[in-house]
Amino acid sequence: MAVQSSGSDDLSGCIRQCDWDENDVCRSCGTDYSPPKKLRPFHLAFPVDNLEKAKQFYVDTLGCTTGREKQESCVFKFFGHQIVAHLVPQMPNMSTNPVDGRDIPAMHFGIVMEWDDWHRLKDKLNKDGVEFVIGPYTRYEDQPGSQATMFIVDPSGNHLEFKSFKDESAIFDSDW
């Protein structure tokens, strides 16, 4: 149910009869009814042992564009976010943790995608012959928090997860 606020004098739109402050936050229950803020891009720096192979993978396989490039690093636009590959002499060891009966790389990054976009990427990766670390499947099927997920690895051994929720309200839900 969408709740509209026109200031603390109008309580008609709230099922709890909230008393909104000047920032559209309820004084009694603390619910924030303010309009969503524009999501800012996140930044992630990660190690690679071959910058040229990393550029080829992130541009050709994932469709990223490059930004600043130096001899020891390269900036990528990763689904609207900034990631930076840093050349290192040796890659760190990677550990896994069991999740839903599978060994999930403990260190990984990725993106939560729209349902249709996730399926398009899955189809592209399959068509391009990209090897999956964990192939596309639905984690927690028919449970709260159900999500489509898949893991791939870049040429330096960094794991990437791409996931999608049919019910996006479950992304940050603590009940599952």
State each model region's role.
Residues F46-P92:
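Core segments of cupin and vicinal oxygen chelate
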Residues G30-Y33, M94-V99:
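Short beta-strand/turn micro-motifs at beta-sheet edges
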Residues C26-E52, H108-F109, M113, S164-W176:
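N-terminal beta-strand motif that seeds the catalytic metal site of vicinal oxygen chelate
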